[in-house]
Amino acid sequence: MRALVIALLLAVVAVSSGAETIDPAVAALLRAVETSGCQMERNGELHEGKAAADHLRLKLERSGRLGMNADQFIDRVASGSTVSGKPYRVLCPGRAPVDSGAWLRARLAEHGRPG
């Protein structure tokens, strides 16, 4: 019985510590990637919006810092590959490719937040 109580207490602590939520500005950036109609280039491969956003969500979750703000997200998660060090680029129809950090900061500015 004692072991069960301890296990339940540990489960409650684990759940409560994992209750960190994604910053609303970061969530908006992920939606922008997903719905923009643009592609993201990662390590030489192109990915449609949904796949790109899913990858960034996974990187964010793996960072262990879901609560990071938009600037931290751009700098630490969404600007480039942690494996190769290569920058991510965004390719939108009819426009020149741009580094993802600049593209994401422009999305922040569109929502009234300087990037």
Predicted regions: what they are:
Residues 1-4:
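Positively charged n-region of N-terminal signal peptides that target proteins for export
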Residues 8-10:
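Compositionally biased, low-complexity intrinsically disordered regions
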Residues 13-16:
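N-terminal signal peptide c-region/cleavage motif recognized by signal peptidases
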Residues 18-62:
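N-terminal secretory signal peptides
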Residues 43-115:
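Compact alpha-helical subdomains of small soluble proteins
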